[in-house]
Design a protein with these regions (language model features):
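Metal-dependent nuclease catalytic regions and adjoining charged, substrate-binding loops involved
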Residues: 199, 212-339
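Accessory/regulatory regions of helicases
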Residues: 1-14, 277
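Hydrophobic (often cysteine-bearing) scaffold residues that line and stabilize catalytic clefts
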Residues: 53, 57, 61, 126, ...
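Mg2+/Mn2+-dependent nuclease catalytic core
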Residues: 150-257
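Short coil/turn segments at secondary-structure boundaries
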Residues: 42-44, 53-55, 77-82, 148-157, ...
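A non-catalytic, helix-rich entry segment at domain boundaries
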Residues: 64-155
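Short amphipathic alpha-helical segments and their helix-coil junctions
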Residues: 15-19, 35-48, 186-192, 255-263
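Nuclease catalytic cores
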Residues: 25-73, 154-157
């Protein structure tokens, strides 16, 4: 199949049921990281207004890459200088990909003021500060247009596909590209501080979900490459090792089975780890307002300032969950009365 004659199937939602459970990769990932945090969010309905430099900057960089790709798909030459000036100094408003409502992006200048300490601090993992990493990002922006092998054919591609009875997978894929042989590449942007280690690349569940979606959306094309693009680091990694699709299928099914088991039993055991520090329900997370970060009593005491502390605030006991949650409610009531 030659480039330029891609057929996008429109039948990917035909078999979905209103009664089916819908899972985006972020929801699956949250359960995998910590079933208790999954429960607090998706079962109990606690949706905090999260704000952090990593989150806001990541969204901004995704939008910049999206605008460049859209221009290329439309056969236009992106005005890189204008794009950079707009996002650095002015900010940007545009429709949200999910709701269609206006989405507002602060300028990078504004983010630098809002998160001044983080913005200029050298990164303990990769070295350069965010300010320095942005220079890497903008220097690499024309690389997509100059790629001699791969051409972008879809960006922020929505999907909603039936996976197994009662389960629907949905989401957005950052970018799909095609080469001269008609083969496809799935690209996912990462604004992480460091690249993945080999263990995360062997069986990447996120790329497997996207593989299923692209296979359904482009049934006549073969997917030959799965790429993580670390946009702040100027580095790329290929996901998947030999036999990874079968392993990922097994991994996804086990994860869905575990979610169903927790739903049946009503028990969602926590998995305390250093990841707790970035969880919106953890008391050590400085980026969550209100009292959401008081909801979990089982968090790890690890912080970036205390990296050797792997103790937990409270040990999980299935028989004492009600008592622990009652104590959380009392603490929240005292907090609300005090403030």
């Amino acid at each position: 199949m030659s480039k330029g004659v891609v057929h996008i199937s429109n039948n990917t939602t035909a078999q979905t049921s209103p009664q089916a459970s819908r899972f985006a990769y972020t929801r699956l990932s949250r359960f995998n990281d910590c079933p208790y945090a999954y429960r607090l969010r998706y079962i109990d309905g606690n949706y905090p207004d999260e704000s952090s430099l990593a989150l806001e900057l990541g969204n901004t960089l995704h939008k910049i890459k999206e605008l460049v790709s859209l221009a290329l798909i439309q056969g236009e030459h992106p005005d890189y200088q204008s794009i950079e000036n707009t996002f650095r100094h002015v900010g940007y408003k545009g429709p949200d990909k999910s709701s269609g409502k206006e989405e507002v992006f602060l300028s990078l200048d504004a983010l630098a003021l809002k998160y001044m300490d983080e913005w200029y601090a050298p990164d303990p993992d990769s070295g350069p500060s965010y300010r320095e990493k942005l220079e890497t990002f903008f220097r690499a922006l024309p690389d997509e247009e100059n790629d001699p092998e791969w051409t972008t054919i879809a960006v922020e591609l929505p999907f909603e596909i039936p996976y197994r009875p009662g389960v629907v997978l949905y989401g957005f894929i950052d970018k799909v590209q095609q080469n001269q042989d008609g083969e496809l590449r799935i690209v996912d942007y990462k604004s992480s501080k460091k690249v993945y280690d080999e263990s995360k690349l062997k069986t990447p569940l996120q790329l497997f979900v996207y593989h299923l979606a692209v296979s359904a959306l482009f049934p006549d094309c073969k997917i030959t490459d799965y790429l993580y693009d670390f946009v702040l680091l100027g580095q790329k990694q290929h996901g998947g090792s030999k036999g990874w699709l079968k392993r990922a299928e097994t991994k996804l099914n086990k994860l869905l089975d575990s979610i169903e088991d927790c739903k049946t039993s009503g028990e969602y055991p926590p998995k305390p780890s250093p990841l707790c520090h970035w969880c919106p329900y953890c008391a050590t997370n400085p980026n969550v307002g209100s009292s959401f970060n008081m909801l979990c009593p089982y968090f790890s005491l690890w912080t970036p300032q205390d990296r050797k502390n792997f103790s937990v605030n409270r040990t999980y006991d299935p028989d004492l969950v009600c008592q622990a949650e009652e104590e959380v409610k009392q603490s929240m009531a005292i907090h609300a009365f005090t403030f």
